[in-house]
Structures are given as C-alpha cells and as structure tokens.
C-alpha cells in the first residue's frame, strides 16, 4: 500500500487515468452490473441505439453518485463505515425497484396485447355489418383488401405500443418517446445503485491523502470505462433486435411473447438481489 500511495502523491495521473478507464471497462464485465437485465430490457422494449446509450449512461451516473455518497457519508458518520455495510441495503432497494419494473413490463405487454385483440374484434364486427349493405363481389374485394391492410396496420400498431410501453391510441394520449425515455432513465439509474468497493476504496485513499482532485479524476475515469462496457452491451442488444427484425419475418410474432420471458428474467434477478441483500442485513 505504501508504494501505491506514494505514486498517488506524486500525481502520476497520466498513468492512472488510462489504467482506471481500463479497470472500469473490465469491472463492467464482472457479474453484478445488471448487464443481462439491461440487455433484456432493451430487447423487451425494442429499444433504439440512442435509448441503449441512455440506459448505460444512466447506470454509470448513479453508480458514480453512489460511490461519492458512500465515501463522503462514511467519513462523516463513522471512521468504521465500510461499503460492505451499505451494499445490502442498496441491494434491497434495487430489488424492490427492479421487481416493480418487471411487473410493469409484464402488465404493459399483457395490456397492449389485450387492447390489440379488442380492437381486432371491434373492427371485424364493424366490417361484418358493413358487408351486409354491399353486393357479394364488392364485399369480397373490400374484405380482402381492407382486412389485409388492417391486419398489417394492427400488427404494426401493436408493436409500436409494445415498444413504447403503451396500450393503444399512443399519438392521442401520450408522447411515447418521452415516457419511454423516463422509464429507461429510471431503470438505468436503478441498475447502477450497487456500489463498487474498489472505486470507493480508491476515492477514500485519495481523500485521506488530501488528493481529492486526483481521486475524483480516477473515479470519473473508472466510471467512463464502466460506461463503455454497459453502453456496448445495450447497443449490441438494440442492433441485434433491429437486424433480426429485418432478416426474419417472424420476429414480430416472437416479440409479442418475448417480453413475458424478459420480465420473468428481470423479476428473478430482482428476487435474487432482494434475498441477497436481506441476508446481508440479517448478518
């Protein structure tokens, strides 16, 4: 530790900044950073690359903020305060929000599918009454063309509602992009609540050595590396969804059921985090 603190006191930032970025990127590859959950979320909402970047950056911002809060809070409250004592509570809070998000995803998908089926039923009923006032030839032509167009339109409408977390009549009731972005930000901020003991330790050492600027720089660099990993995961998920949708005509049908599995996966992650956090609190 003496050699490390000496290097910090010498201010060799040119060496530590790239190293911190690399360590942050490698740290993002370790388990426990919600990468699977974030990818499942992006796939479930058929998110864009912009939304994937937003998700990764939100997770990084909350991750960095938690590091600072714990470091400074620990110094103020008690010298014996450690990151391990706060982690179970943060895990429990994250679990509650994550499980709520999973429930929302499941309910939103079910509601969108139900409203879509109701619209289909209402249209068929109206279409049947409309045919009774026309001759057979016109009825056949109208039914074929109009039904085909409606089936395509309804499927597209349902997919838009599914992707933007709305049931029906999106343009009249909501601005889907804004609502979806807020939901993505909330989910990303939640995913970054679990602190990194390594980053907290580095920051505490720098504070104790009265090298606050260097400590802040290292933590920011560490967070940049972490953001690169998380954003890459999200963008990869978004691109994969877009490419598969273009090359496979049956993707939209599969996408109607995929959110159920995604919400289940996210819910299981939330339950695991909650149990782990509860066990940590009870110790």
From Swiss-Prot:
Residues on the Periplasmic side?
Answer: 1-12, 78-86, 206-218, 282-283
- Keyword Transport annotated: yes
Residue ranges annotated as coiled coil are none
The GO annotation for biological process reads: cobalt ion transport; response to cobalt ion; response to nickel cation
Keyword terms, alphabetized: Cell inner membrane, Cell membrane, Cobalt, Cobalt transport, Ion transport, Membrane, Nickel, Nickel transport, Transmembrane, Transmembrane helix, Transport
Please classify the protein's predominant subcellular localization into one broad category: membrane
Q: Which domain of life is it from?
A: Bacteria
Q: How does it sit in the membrane?
A: Multi-pass membrane protein
**Key word Cell inner membrane present in the record?**
yes
InterPro entries, A to Z: Ni/Co_transpt_high_affinity, NiCoT_RcnA
Tell me which parts of the chain lie in the Cytoplasmic compartment. 34-56, 108-184, 240-260
TM annotation in the entry: 13-33, 57-77, 87-107, 185-205, 219-239, 261-281
Give me the ranges of the annotated region Disordered: 127-162
Write the protein's name: Nickel/cobalt efflux system RcnA
Where is the sequence biased in composition, kind Basic and acidic residues? 129-144, 151-162
Q: Which family does the similarity line name?
A: Belongs to the NiCoT transporter (TC 2.A.52) family. RcnA subfamily.
